[in-house]
Amino acid sequence: MERYLSRRESGFHIHRSDDNSLMRRIYSSMNMFNSYHANCWPTDAGRTGAIFNLEFNADGNVVVAATERKCVLVFDAITQKEIFKVPDAHTDSVNCIKFFDERLFATGSDDFTVALWDLRNMKQKLRVLHGHSNWVKNIEYSSKDKLLVSSGFDGSIFTWDINSQTEQGLISQRVFHASGLMRCRISPTGDKLVLCTSGGYIMIIHHLDLTTLHKDLCGFRPGIYRLMQLGEQYIPQAAKYDHVFSKRQKKNRVELVTDFPENNDAEMIMALQIHPHCCCMLTRNVSCDEQSEWTCIHDINEEPVRSEDEQDEVEPQPKRKRVSTTLASRSSLNESQDQDTVGLTPRQARRPLRVSSVQVFQLDNSGAGRGASDNPSVLTRSDSFIPDIWAAEVTVQERAIRQNRARVSNNHVSGYNFVYAISSGVLPLRQLGANSLMGSSTSPRPLTTPPPTESNQSSSSSSSSSSSSSSSSSSNNSDTTVRLEIGNRLRLRSFNSPVTTPTFKENGHSILVNAKKLLYYAAETNTKPGFIKEPGFSADGRVVCSPYGNGVRLFGYSEDCCDYPKCQAFEEVKSKPRKLVELAKITEHQDVVLCAKFSPREPLLVTGCNGGEVTWYRPNL
């Protein structure tokens, strides 16, 4: 440290190695020096419930906490003292906070509303925004378009013009809908919108224009497009949106990110942050087995265009898989409308049910869905039916109805229950025998009455997220109703068994293959399953803070705490993703840590836990 300061005082050039070693010493020496409970009366400690989120203002001198029991806490970041406490900021849990400037901020809640606040007068809200039909889980602000952006578990993304008030309220618009939406983030430069979902994929919208987003992506359903990719079954209503992935899409171009570490079959991607310099994105996901959580860093930038393609002025063709299909002559399916997930009644049980079998449906030429065993003539008319991955949408709706009916029997409250999920497709499907695929019964049990086995009941009571998608396949010789026994989970996979893999004779179609984006990863503990843990970047982007049990871990990209890799180093990491390097591990809380946030101005870290404690950390040099 003395050598570094001496060189800087003398005006000598600071070597990168010296800078890295200094940053490593600063971050690895982080220690707790104050806590919210230490400044409370003993009777007040923990009354606010869990701390779900923390947010600094742009100057870094104010911290706002969102709590489980409807409360908003405002702290002075310099003295760590509580400035304001709003006990009934909402009528339900407060989930998220977003500052517009030094004094104005918004909060989102499980009461389906967004509230606007001014630090100069915390006695009342500036305005309450109504529009969502489910829990509001994320708020962003686009300084470029001057629009507030909110998203919730209803799958909807709304924009609000907070500068144009009318008698009916603020001017708002629903610009996009994605089933299973968990989080959305706008990059600091305002040119990208990133969505993470419960479907095991991340969606990046490049060259973001919120004013035309609704028109540019009207009708596009990323969940159905992902089903087509996983099942390798051509779906006309999904494939007709190939143009949104094209380089010719000058505004609101879409890219899907689906690669994850080995042994991490990502399902519920529940937290999302973007690097301060817009280099990458940080996510935290729950694997499909619900036994592990993972922190991952993916590249957020567009894939480079080859120089020969630029010179020839020819659009580069993305990598695609060739699939054969007979749908070219039978693509007259009715376009489905976007449907919100079923609304939830607050404070009721939210534990999902599990399903252990799937009936594969098929569509005839008129688009009417039915089970393959409903009509005996199916076996002799194999060419008049098409594989129906659209049955996944029916499954989603049926599952939501079942969950709605089952809420009374379970009192568990989870941060991401009632969000349907499919897995990312990283791990192979477990081996299934032909007998289990075909089933011994010709009339399978309906989806609404799963078998009440002990394993299903135990899994249903110990897990907090479930998947609800299905794929269908048919044989070249006959169409048979297939019950896919996949344990306690509905999973979508591409099957290679001759029993289920269809073969077609007509022209083939290509399906886009997503680019590899994974850079770094780390395995996490799965303590307090059902609660969302929010990681975060440091202000300089060198360090990642990730909740880990009753504490946090600080990760770096390398042992020497170097900055984000560039040029050749970046290409090496991208070709072979690496584990994040643990710089420090701090355990100071009495309960599981749910959120962590760095100050935008100094090496100051704040964490919040399930017990309601807010803890402050700084370097101890």
Swiss-Prot record:
Compositional bias (Polar residues): 324-342
Residues modified as Phosphoserine: 307, 494, 497
GO cellular component: Cul4-RING E3 ubiquitin ligase complex
Keywords associated with the record: Phosphoprotein, Repeat, WD repeat
Transmembrane segments: none
Keyword Repeat belongs to the record: yes
Pfam families registered for this protein in UniProt: WD40 (PF00400)
Residue ranges, annotated region (Disordered): 305-349, 437-483
Bias type Low complexity, positions: 454-478
Name of this protein: DDB1- and CUL4-associated factor 10 homolog
Source species of the chain: Drosophila melanogaster
